Amino acid sequence: DTFPLWYDQETEGIRTDARVCNLSYLQTDWYIDQMVRPAYNSPSLPISWPRLDYCSGTSEYVEVNPDAKEEILKYYKEQPEAAKATWGDEPFELKNILKYWVRSKDAETHFIPTDTLYVTIDKNAVRKSGMMMASDTIPDRMVISLKGKNALYKSDLMMLELIAQSNWVRPIYVAMTVGQENYMNLGDN
């Protein structure tokens, strides 16, 4: 699926401003290294993780444990200041999940504590991106469902990182060569 696109860029010079990313290779540190560097006329992909957080043997998979959600909500209700200092203002916001849970060095918190993640949508960024949407139809949040998943693998985590960091600066297109369940039900977003 990506090889013809790579050919077009490499040999024909077509769309060298676009970045082709093979999601099955995104499981490897050497490929992530390539994605965090500019290529042709395309800037790097928005992956903010330091290499030590994705190198081989690190973040190969992270368990999804939605049973922890109620305990976290209880902590936010009973001790809001301490909870916000620990996990950010929005506990299930994608950026906070990646920062405080997925990339945690503490084994006690190195998991995903929910099966529903959120990305708060910057409506001004969407408008500036040139998307043809009426202002009143831009939702406040994008919902990412992990229902039925026991774990996310490195390629899944990198895809979530791209979504979390992109802020509508560049579009993300995904070729669906496998079932939608492999893409965290992102088909409608």
Over which residues does each language-model region extend?
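ER/secretory pathway lumenal C-terminal domains and tails of membrane proteins involved
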Residues: F3-N189
